[in-house]
């Protein structure tokens, strides 16, 4: 579902559209009247509708209950509009909150926006319509100071409870050098430690019943089964989990704030570190979103190279996930086999990009350089090696009766629950929903590849891990097609906003030299607009929503990651289960905390 036009590859590919022809605009107009909202033209590929604050919940409920409903709150966050200069035709706003809704049946999205005055930063909570709004509203309050009236627990989520200020406001410093030196006194240390003490009453929990007390157990933030700096406070009756509270933010780096201080090109290395196992997969949505802003169409060779690198990193990530899941259940050996196989993936990646985990290799309009001589042999060796190894993982470990006994039927949820909590990727497909962005909304030429989308039926831990095995096989299938059908042609687009121009042209045309000088000094200037790109990342759907104000840097960079939604779902799934089941459930989610905390 894109606005890509291919009739003339020399013209800008991404047109600014208002999507007034989208059926949902007619449905909203018939129900609320055309005067009730303002439609914004963007390059996001979806209708963007400003609604009145008083009607927001009514509009969301209406869309939620349509015959083809918008069943998922995909994203929710805010924007500080005070310094934005290109706002012609939009409602007056000091701040805005956006709600990105997704419909599976329509395969369409819509973005609702609400304008807010700095003197009245209040909007009603959406948690009664979409339960996963909880964490998103907490983060939006924390970062912008926007209060969501009626929210069950509006507290900080990324920053320490003692933090002062709202970091994503434009008047909040972006550099550490703009702050006074931090001094940790004994008094401060005591206050910080006190703030980490869990108080059950704050979360509506009881300390016990008439007959016995509950135990409150900290799992993490340094427990090996929490897979990173992640803390879950468990309310236990013996081994049974009565309730739990996930505690995130220990890995927060301010990635979205960094996007406001880096040029469009220099931000690419930061994207690698959002989900540090994904490598080039993380670069894909960012560069595609910037290319929409710039109106760049990349050559077919670039598309295929990007797909090839993305699938190599997908295999690399899935191998680690499968082996650590097996380790969480109690088997050690497969982890060592997996690292042998992952090294073979890295051999190919390093030969092509020059780096391993964080190559920062994709460029706006292309890739850093062409494929090296001999890449075919390296890829061929890996494609000949991996299928048999994958079979051995299944036979030796995943078909083991003990592993199946620990994971079949454990931490199961259905499609309705998955959509309510914003679950994407294998976690959603394990419930029977065949939603894979590579198939449903192809990008970077995925529509030219022949592959299947594995789906499950039970939505349990075992289904989730077996889906990843099948996804590995499909990634190998895609790589085989890259090997056999790599197009000829340039590795970058011939566009003034992309990679440096050919040297011979700079020696003939002074205008080209001036453009090149500006690009490498200040950085490229992107047209004022908004763009959006989602991709099928290693752990679910990852997306970038970019706002340009006609500058060398992004005005607002919103990064939606899959792991954030997946961890928010934990309490609803694990209540009533045992602690041992929680360990298996955490291992089946496939998350890293950099992807959660950004």
Curated annotation (Swiss-Prot):
In the N-terminal section; belongs to the complex I 30 kDa subunit family. Gene3D superfamilies: Cytochrome-c3 Hydrogenase, chain B, NADH:ubiquinone oxidoreductase, 30kDa subunit. It comes from Yersinia pestis. It catalyses: a quinone + NADH + 5 H(+)(in) = a quinol + NAD(+) + 4 H(+)(out). Keywords: Cell inner membrane, Cell membrane, Membrane, Multifunctional enzyme, NAD, Quinone, Translocase, Transport, Ubiquinone. Its EC number is 7.1.1.-. It is found in: Cell inner membrane. One of its GO terms (cellular component) is plasma membrane. Its main location: membrane. NDH-1 shuttles electrons from NADH, via FMN and iron-sulfur (Fe-S) centers, to quinones in the respiratory chain. The immediate electron acceptor for the enzyme in this species is believed to be ubiquinone. Couples the redox reaction to proton translocation (for every two electrons transferred, four hydrogen ions are translocated across the cytoplasmic membrane), and thus conserves the redox energy in a proton gradient. It is a peripheral membrane protein. The keyword GTP-binding does not apply. This is NADH-quinone oxidoreductase subunit C/D. HAMAP family: NDH1_NuoC, NDH1_NuoCD_1, NDH1_NuoD. Residues 1-189 are annotated as: NADH dehydrogenase I subunit C.
């Amino acid at each position: 579902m894109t606005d890509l036009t291919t009739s003339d590859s020399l013209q800008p590919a991404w047109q600014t559209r208002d999507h007034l022809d989208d059926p949902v605009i007619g449905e909203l107009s018939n129900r609320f009247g055309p005067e009730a909202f303002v439609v914004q033209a963007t390059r996001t590929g979806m209708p963007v509708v400003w609604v009145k604050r008083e009607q927001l919940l009514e509009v969301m409920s209406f869309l939620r209950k349509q015959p083809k409903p918008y069943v998922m709150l995909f994203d929710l966050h805010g924007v500080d509009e005070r310094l934005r200069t290109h706002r012609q035709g939009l409602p007056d706003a000091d701040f805005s909150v956006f709600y990105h809704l997704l419909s599976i049946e329509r395969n369409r999205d819509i973005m609702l926006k609400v304008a807010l005055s700095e003197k009245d930063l209040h909007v009603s909570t959406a948690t009664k319509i979409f339960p996963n709004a909880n964490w998103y509203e907490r983060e939006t309050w924390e970062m912008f100071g926007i209060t969501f009236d009626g929210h069950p627990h509006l507290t900080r989520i990324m920053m320490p409870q003692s933090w002062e200020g709202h970091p994503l406001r434009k008047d909040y410093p972006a550099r550490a050098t703009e702050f006074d030196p931090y001094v940790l006194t004994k008094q401060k240390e005591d206050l910080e430690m006190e703030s980490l003490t869990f108080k059950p009453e704050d979360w509506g929990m009881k300390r016990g019943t008439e007959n016995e007390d509950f135990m409150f157990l900290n799992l993490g933030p340094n427990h090996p089964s929490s897979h990173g700096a992640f803390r879950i406070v468990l309310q236990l009756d013996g081994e049974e989990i009565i309730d739990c509270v996930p505690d995130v933010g220990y890995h927060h780096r301010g990635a979205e704030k960094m996007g406001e201080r880096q040029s469009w090109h220099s931000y690419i290395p930061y994207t690698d570190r959002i989900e540090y196992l994904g490598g080039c997969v993380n670069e894909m949505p960012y560069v595609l979103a910037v290319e929409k802003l710039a109106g760049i169409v990349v050559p077919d060779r670039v598309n295929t190279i990007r797909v090839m690198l993305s699938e190599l990193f997908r295999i690399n990530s899935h191998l680690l996930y499968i082996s650590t899941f097996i380790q969480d259940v109690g088997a050690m050996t497969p982890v060592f086999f997996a690292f042998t196989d992952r090294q073979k993936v890295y051999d190919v990646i390093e030969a092509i990009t020059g780096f391993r985990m964080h190559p920062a290799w994709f460029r706006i309009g292309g890739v850093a350089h062409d494929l090296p001589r001999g890449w075919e042999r390296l890829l061929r060796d890996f494609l000949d090696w991996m299928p048999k190894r994958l079979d051995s993982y299944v036979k030796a470990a995943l078909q083991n009766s003990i592993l199946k006994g620990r994971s079949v039927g454990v931490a199961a949820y259905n499609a309705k629950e998955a959509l309510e909590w914003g679950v994407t990727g294998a976690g959603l497909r394990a419930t029977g929903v065949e939603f894979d962005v590579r198939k449903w909304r192809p990008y970077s030429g995925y529509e030219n590849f022949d592959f299947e989308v594995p789906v499950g039926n039970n939505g349990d831990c075992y289904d989730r891990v077996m889906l990843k095995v099948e996804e590995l096989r499909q990634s190998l299938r895609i790589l085989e097609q890259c090997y056999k059908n790599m197009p000829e042609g340039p590795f970058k687009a011939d566009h003034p906003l992309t990679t440096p121009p050919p040297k011979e042209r700079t020696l003939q045309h002074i205008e080209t030299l001036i453009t090149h000088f500006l690009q490498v000094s200040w950085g490229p200037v992107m047209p004022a607009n908004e763009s959006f790109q989602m991709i099928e990342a290693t752990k679910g759907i990852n997306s970038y929503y970019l706002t340009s104000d006609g500058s060398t840097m992004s005005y607002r960079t919103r990064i939606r990651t899959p792991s954030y939604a997946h961890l928010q779902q934990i309490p609803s799934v694990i209540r009533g289960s045992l602690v041992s089941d929680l360990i298996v459930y955490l291992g089946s989610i496939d998350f890293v905390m950099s992807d959660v905390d950004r």
